[in-house]
Amino acid sequence: MQSAAIQDLSKERDKLKGEVEELHAAFKKLLAGNRREKFINPDQQLLEFPDDKELQAALDAAKREAEQEVETITYTRNKQKKEAKPRTDSFPAHLRREETVKPLSDDDQKLADSGREVFRQLIQEVLCYKRPELFVRAYFQLILKEAQAENTKETIEKLRAEIPAGLGEKGRYDASVAAAIACGKFELHIPYYRLQDIFASSGWTPSRSTLDYLMDLTAEAVQELPLLMTRRVLQSNCIGMDDTGVKLIMPKEIPEIVQGDLRTQRLIEKMLEAKKEGKTSLDAKMWAYSGDEDQPYDIFDFRVSRHRDGPAELLAGYSGHVMADCYSGNLNVVLDPKSSMTRMACWAHARRKIFEAKDNDRTASALPLALIGQLYDIERLAMDWPSEKRTAIRQSDSRLILDRMRAWLDGSVAQSILPASKLGQAVQYIRNHWDALCVFTKDGRLPVDNNWVERLMKRIAIGRKNWLFVGSVRAGMRNANIMTLVASAHRHDLDVHMYLVDVITHLNRGTAKLEQLLPDIWKASHPEAIRTYREEERRDKAELARLRTASRISQS
């Protein structure tokens, strides 16, 4: 009896010891480790499958196709280099030049006066920076001095009605000021107190309440546009979604219950829970939903909790695909018996779990990492292909690799991994969500992972480090609407300030159709607002990744 108890204690000790070692390794990596999930396969033979003739034939065909891809990409890149304009040391021609001309010496001036030709020789150009400039646009009306007072008043009121509508009392603030604040806080993640310094350096020192007031007015003016983007996103074939935490300052008073208002109901629940624990803030959530390439908008939704109410309310009636993490709240919404949505799971999440466990068992983790790597090789090669062609290669090559992965999951190596170990948990994660992980092979338009939505979360994470908290539920909802405009403009490589100025101006005046202000449509008529260097940078990066992938496959 005592011996059995000792054995149980020994097993428990070994289990706890293993957990401590895993936590210690994770902590060391968090502090000083490389966070890149780069995996170099220690045994390239793992990528060969002589026992599986169908898969080996597909891999051989992929190598031949990769060789052709290398030739195509190399030819295209070399052609682009030849056609590229030679780089010069001169600054852009459209920048204003302030000229400083040094006069001739006295002796040379005499020669010039006698008829010697003089020409100007550029010695050097120096780039200078002038801080942003604020100015006041004053409107005047000429009035006859003898005019009656009532006629003068009528003329002034008529003129005031003709002045372009601004924001605030009597329209005192132009849309350009509101756009500058919105870009500062939601694109560049600058808190209000630092925005004060920026404006003060240009001669105007606004209070933080004034800056916040202008954001209120901005959100009110543009509120219909985020709603339109949301409706468009719900027409997507696939929606990516994710969420992250935001600190919400505890409201002073518990609001009254409103029948059917789930937001208020969740707020009351969270407040009562926080007050019971003695907290002064609430752990709210900012959700992000991203449409596909046919509905290219990124929308944000502020909620006081991670309860399923948020996605359930926003996705009500949606019948497409949903790519999200495997949080139970998401699963309950997508897998609800009344739902017609198709759940997808993220291969980047699956890979990350195995990668984080590889130090505990490098031998067992090598094959699944290599197989997932091959899935991504196919995705990189097919990145710019038509969706029909991408569907075909997924149905052939990707499907065979997934079959090999399934065989490994059901095989002796995976079965022998301790379920409680980190690798065992990663393997079980893939087993649990296998069907959702394989959905992408059915349609070339579907994504293989949720990375593009996770990048949206970085916007909130960086902003959170600067502005620290949200002051109220209303402010959270307001911020979500403005962030929707900023992120969607950024997705289309637009100058966000130029876009917001135009959007705020037209919506405040009611002088444009809402659809014309969607960033993809607006972009087509405003080429001067496109950050072409970002488009070129992304295109070059993707092309280089395809070239490296094709080269590696063709040489393996």
What residue spans do the PLM features occupy?
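Short, positively charged, Gly/Tyr-enriched micro-motifs
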Residues: 1, 7, 23, 131-237, ...
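Short, flexible loop/hinge motifs at secondary-structure junctions
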Residues: 1-171, 240-241, 247, 260-279, ...
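Mobile genetic element proteins and their domesticated derivatives, centered on retroelements
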Residues: 33, 108-110, 146, 181, ...
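Gly/Pro-rich turn-and-neighbor structural signature
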Residues: 87-92, 96-112, 193-313, 317, ...
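Short helix/loop capping segments that flank catalytic or ligand/cofactor-binding pockets
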Residues: 118-120, 154-158, 248-250, 257-258, ...
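Structured ligand/cofactor/substrate-binding pocket environments in proteins
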Residues: 172-179, 187-190, 298-336, 476-483
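Conserved beta-strand -> loop -> alpha-helix junction used to position metal-binding or nucleic-acid-contacting
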Residues: 238-239, 326, 335-370
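Acidic/histidine-rich catalytic cores and adjacent linkers
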Residues: 317-320, 324-331, 370-556
